[in-house]
């Protein structure tokens, strides 16, 4: 059984965070879309006004990965607001390296996130899961998550930077 600890990410973890972000993107067959740099992660998460918060799962040296990594999982989150229900914790990314799955690491990260949400008086935790990612869907549903796309019919949209710039400069 793996021994591990969950802790808040530190600035020196940014290279591991970027590695895990890229691993998650590869798992989702979207690795070409990761353009974020380690420098941006550092500035955006550890400056005076962080845009995100992050928990990491760390294993002791004797359990490091075959590539020599001690950080084996992470959850990136931030706080947002819903005018109907108030404060929310939004889970942006959540990933545990394949060789460390099934050891309770993901459950412990989610438990820690739940404690953060409760402490900050959040009404709920929101997140996205790819439709094809049945293992994750089952993981969340076992813990009480509801699928808003089927239950409430919500659709997710995005406006890319190109169109933001266009709208921002329209007269």
UniProtKB/Swiss-Prot annotation:
InterPro entries membership: Acyl_CoA_acyltransferase, Diverse_Substrate_AcTransf, GNAT_dom
Residues engaged in binding acetyl-CoA: 94-96, 102-107, 133-136, 140-143
EC number, UniProt record: 2.3.1.57
Subcellular location: Cytoplasm
Catalytic activity: an alkane-alpha,omega-diamine + acetyl-CoA = an N-acetylalkane-alpha,omega-diamine + CoA + H(+); spermidine + acetyl-CoA = N(1)-acetylspermidine + CoA + H(+); spermine + acetyl-CoA = N(1)-acetylspermine + CoA + H(+)
GO MF term list: diamine N-acetyltransferase activity; identical protein binding; N-acetyltransferase activity; spermidine binding
Domain of life of the organism encoding this protein: Eukaryota
Signal peptide positions (record): none
Record bears the keyword Endoplasmic reticulum: no
PROSITE patterns in alphabetical order: GNAT
Residues reported to bind substrate: 27-28, 92, 126-128, 152
Any one GO BP annotation for this protein: putrescine catabolic process
UniProt pathway: Amine and polyamine degradation; putrescine degradation; N-acetylputrescine from putrescine: step 1/1
Record-annotated N-acetyltransferase domain positions: 4-171
Record: active site: 140
Cellular component, GO annotation: cytoplasm
Class of the enzyme per the UniProt entry, highest EC level: transferase
Principal subcellular localization: cytoplasm
Annotated function: Enzyme which catalyzes the acetylation of polyamines. Substrate specificity: norspermidine = spermidine >> spermine > N(1)-acetylspermine. This highly regulated enzyme allows a fine attenuation of the intracellular concentration of polyamines. Also involved in the regulation of polyamine transport out of cells.
Family statement: Belongs to the acetyltransferase family.
Assembly information from the UniProt record: Homodimer.
Full protein name: Diamine acetyltransferase 1
Species, as recorded: Gallus gallus
Gene symbol of the encoding locus: SAT1
């Amino acid at each position: 059984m793996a021994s591990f600890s969950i802790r808040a990410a530190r600035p020196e973890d940014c290279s591991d965070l970027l590695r895990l972000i890229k691993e998650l993107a590869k798992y989702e067959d979207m690795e070409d879309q990761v353009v974020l740099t380690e420098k941006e992660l550092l500035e955006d998460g550890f400056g005076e006004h962080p845009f995100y918060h992050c928990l990491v799962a760390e294993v002791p040296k004797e359990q490091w990965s075959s590539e020599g990594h001690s950080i084996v999982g992470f959850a990136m989150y931030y706080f947002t607001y819903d005018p109907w229900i108030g404060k929310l914790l939004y889970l942006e990314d959540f990933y545990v390296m394949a060789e460390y799955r099934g050891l309770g690491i993901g459950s412990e990260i989610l438990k820690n996130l739940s404690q953060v949400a409760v402490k900050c008086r959040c009404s709920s935790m929101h997140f996205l899961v790819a439709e094809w990612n049945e293992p994750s869907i089952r993981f969340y549903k076992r813990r009480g998550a509801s699928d808003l796309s089927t239950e409430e019919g919500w659709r997710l949209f995005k406006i890319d930077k190109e169109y933001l710039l266009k709208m921002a400069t329209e007269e």
